Swiss-Prot record:
One of its GO terms (molecular function) is DNA binding. Belongs to the YbaB/EbfC family. Its main location: cytoplasm. It is found in: Cytoplasm, Nucleoid. InterPro entries: YbaB-like_sf, YbaB/EbfC. This is Nucleoid-associated protein TTE0040. It comes from Caldanaerobacter subterraneus subsp. tengcongensis (strain DSM 15242 / JCM 11007 / NBRC 100824 / MB4) (Thermoanaerobacter tengcongensis). GO terms for cellular component: bacterial nucleoid; cytosol. The keyword tRNA processing does not apply. Keywords: Cytoplasm, DNA-binding. SUPFAM superfamilies: YbaB-like. Homodimer. Binds to DNA and alters its conformation. May be involved in regulation of gene expression, nucleoid organization and DNA protection.
Length: 111
């Protein structure tokens, strides 16, 4: 039996090596995701929220035409909708990038 090997050809050393390689790829991906952004919009583009690949909001843009001091609730709803969409889009981007590394396996706790 080879060093680190088990019956049936299972080799713990190869498994550890693959896990370390995956960790390096994930770290690189996390750094790249910091530079990528996605956006969410509402009100036909009147409100736009931008999030990065770490699910952090980086900007919110509000068209002045949608600002009405007598109807703050509508503006709040538009901002909330845009932010939620941006965060969902960030989640999808992260999942897509992770699938490239993990081969589609869902590994709990990575993100």
């Amino acid at each position: 039996m080879a060093k680190g090997g088990f019956p049936g050809g299972f080799n713990i050393n190869n498994m550890i090596k693959q896990a370390q390689q995956m960790q390096e790829e994930i770290k690189k991906m996390q750094e790249e995701l910091m530079q990528k952004t996605v956006e969410g919009t509402s009100g036909g583009g009147m409100v736009k929220a931008v999030a990065n690949g770490r699910k952090e909001l980086v900007s919110i843009n509000i068209n002045p035409e949608v600002v009405d001091k007598d109807d703050v609730e509508t503006l709040e709803d538009l901002v909330l909708a845009a932010v939620n969409q941006a965060l969902r889009n960030a989640e999808e981007m992260i999942a897509s990038e992770m699938a490239k590394i993990t081969g589609g396996f869902n590994i709990p706790g990575l993100f």
